[in-house]
Amino acid sequence: MVALSCRDALVWSLTPGQAGDGPEGRQLIEAIGVQDAPVYLLMDSAYGGNDLRASALERNLQPIVPSHPQRKLPWPLDKQRYRQRNEVERLFRRIKAYRRVFTRYDKLDVVYAAFVSMALILEHLR
């Protein structure tokens, strides 16, 4: 999920539980498209690969992600901006407050995705 704030999701997708974060993150960044002005992209350390970072920079997105501790040449991290990443985590918590999303009753992906979309819309309108 790419979110603008603790209430607004920009783009999201549904993946299997065993799917890796890197390839999906690349697809989400591609879905955002190229931005006119630089936009800060607060990311989890799971998205800290060179390919994903380069893909974000090509689209005028400034990735704010900590580099791996073993990395020889760590990239700079804006710690003040990275602290704002908890807003996205709060959005996940709010979505999971909807019982149907949290318990995953639905067998079909499209039905589950519809309820996640509904939860995102309700959170945006709140």
Regions found by a protein language model. Give the residues of each.
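Anionic-ligand binding region
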Residues: M1, I32, A56
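Mobile genetic element proteins and their domesticated derivatives, centered on retroelements
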Residues: M1-V2, R7, G25, D44, ...
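Short, well-ordered strand-loop elements centered on a beta-strand within folded domains, enriched
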Residues: C6-L14, L125
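Internal, well-ordered alpha-helical scaffold/interface segments
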Residues: R7-D8, P23-E30, N50, A54
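Active-site beta-loop-alpha junctions of metal-dependent nucleic acid enzymes
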Residues: W12-Q35, Y40
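Helix-centered, glycine/charged polyanion-binding patches within enzymatic domains
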Residues: Q18, A37-L41, S45-L108
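Charged phosphate-binding loop/patch that engages nucleotide di/tri-phosphates or the phosphate backbone
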Residues: F115-R126
